């Protein structure tokens, strides 16, 4: 295997020894419609319903040459290109071709591919040189086109966010890279709209305060201005502009997240059986969260299909929580969303909690780290930890939250 990336924690974005390929399929829905209906080729094609209140789902590049873009009202699109051809969405076909493309990349090039959406994904390498990376990206791109007739664009960087940005710069059917030492030359001249995570309000505020290029953000030293213009996202946006996208070591990543995964014994589980497996995995993970006296800021659910494609969805939570029901609802929602795209042919299920911090309502003695608490001598231990262990073991046998602490019942 050329490279693997197996952490469930989505906060990892950069590491000097890592290199990311970010795949973005070009006009994917429109390309699928053209493959299924060859008569649509070489015509301005819009995917969406031809009604005045609808919006453009996506369109091919010929339609884009008229100024049409995703999210545009259909009425406006028809003003720009009255001769446009329409195709209704066929999500089953989109999922089918998406799976084919990702499976081909994984199998042909012996890579572990992580899908982020139906038409975006990434692979991660360790110690791959930029020259070899570019050559490999072109080979992947060419192979997908020759075998399946799809164009994909690829961004390459030692930082995840930069790889994503430059996959968009590479469109259509290109490969572009940007490494840390190239940020001033390649990243700074780009308009700030290219930064992931900037909303319309932030963009308007940015223009009013003379932030037009990414370089304008990078050069700004006024933290107060940054906070006023970009809100809580100012720090991460500034880091991206500097090419310093949240670097951390593998050990740091592991310590800030906990995960439980299970490889399934059989490949023909029913939907109900998969739901039961998910609940069992969640219960084990939740017990670990309780016994570590921590709360989390987000959840990731990961599925590996029979063709070894890794699919994951994550959700950040507004407030830190260690609430069982809150976390279970999020996990099930993410799982069901993934299942719609992947189907029942599942090889592995994984769940993780990320963004961990100490839970102030836990019963651990103040100032004592978890590993110190576990390894403390009997005279130094309190009865709280033993009680938590007992509650955990009973609930493991008879169902979660059958036994709870009185203060938790009072709070609810």
UniProtKB/Swiss-Prot annotation:
InterPro entries: DNA/RNA_pol_sf, DNA_pol_Y-fam_lit_finger_sf, DNA_pol_Y-fam_little_finger, DNA_polymerase-Y, DNApol_IV, Rev_trsase/Diguanyl_cyclase, UmuC
Coiled coil region boundaries: none
PANTHER family: DNA POLYMERASE KAPPA (PTHR11076:SF33), DNA REPAIR POLYMERASE UMUC / TRANSFERASE FAMILY MEMBER (PTHR11076)
Superkingdom of the organism of origin: Bacteria
Domain named UmuC: residues: 20-199
Homology family: Belongs to the DNA polymerase type-Y family.
Name of protein: Uncharacterized protein MG360 homolog
GO biological process: error-prone translesion synthesis; SOS response
GO cellular component: cytosol
A GO molecular function held by the record: damaged DNA binding
Origin species: Mycoplasma pneumoniae (strain ATCC 29342 / M129 / Subtype 1)
């Amino acid at each position: 295997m050329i490279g693997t990336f197996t952490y469930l924690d989505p906060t990892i974005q950069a590491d000097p020894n890592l290199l990311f390929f970010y795949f973005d399929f070009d006009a994917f829905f429109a390309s699928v419609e053209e493959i299924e209906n060859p008569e649509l080729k070489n015509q301005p094609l819009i995917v969406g319903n031809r009604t005045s209140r609808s919006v453009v789902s996506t369109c091919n590049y010929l339609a884009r040459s008229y100024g049409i873009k995703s999210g545009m009202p259909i009425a406006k699109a028809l003003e720009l290109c009255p001769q446009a051809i329409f195709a209704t969405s066929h999500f089953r076909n989109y999922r089918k071709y998406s799976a084919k493309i990702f499976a081909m990349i994984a199998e042909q090039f012996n890579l572990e591919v992580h899908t982020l959406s139906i038409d975006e994904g990434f692979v991660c390498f360790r110690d791959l040189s930029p020259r070899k990376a570019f050559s490999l990206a072109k080979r992947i791109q060419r192979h997908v086109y020759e075998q399946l007739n799809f164009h994909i664009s690829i961004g390459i960087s030692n930082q995840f966010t930069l790889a994503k940005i430059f996959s968009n710069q590479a469109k259509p059917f290109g490969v572009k890279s940007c490494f840390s030492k190239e940020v001033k030359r390649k990243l700074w001249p780009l308009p700030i709209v290219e930064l992931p995570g900037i909303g319309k309000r932030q963009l308007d505020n940015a223009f009013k305060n003379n932030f037009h290029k990414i370089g304008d953000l990078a050069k700004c030293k006024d933290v107060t201005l940054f906070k006023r213009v970009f809100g809580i996202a100012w720090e991460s946006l500034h880091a991206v502009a500097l090419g310093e996208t949240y670097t951390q070591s593998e050990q740091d990543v592991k310590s800030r997240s906990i995960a439980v995964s299970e490889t399934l014994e059989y490949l023909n589980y029913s939907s109900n059986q998969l739901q039961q497996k998910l609940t069992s995995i969640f219960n084990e993970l939740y017990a670990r969260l309780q016994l570590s006296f921590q709360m989390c800021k987000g959840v990731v659910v990961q599925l590996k299909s029979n063709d070894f494609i890794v699919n994951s969805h994550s959700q950040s939570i507004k407030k830190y929580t260690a609430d069982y029901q809150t976390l279970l609802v999020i996990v099930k929602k993410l799982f069901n969303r993934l299942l719609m795209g992947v189907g029942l042919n599942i090889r592995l299920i994984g769940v993780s909690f990320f963004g961990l911090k100490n839970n102030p309502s836990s019963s651990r003695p103040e100032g004592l780290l978890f590993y110190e608490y576990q390894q403390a001598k009997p005279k130094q231990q309190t009865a709280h930890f033993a009680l938590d262990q007992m509650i955990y073991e009973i609930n493991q046998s008879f169902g979660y939250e059958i036994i709870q602490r009185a203060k938790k019942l009072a709070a609810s």
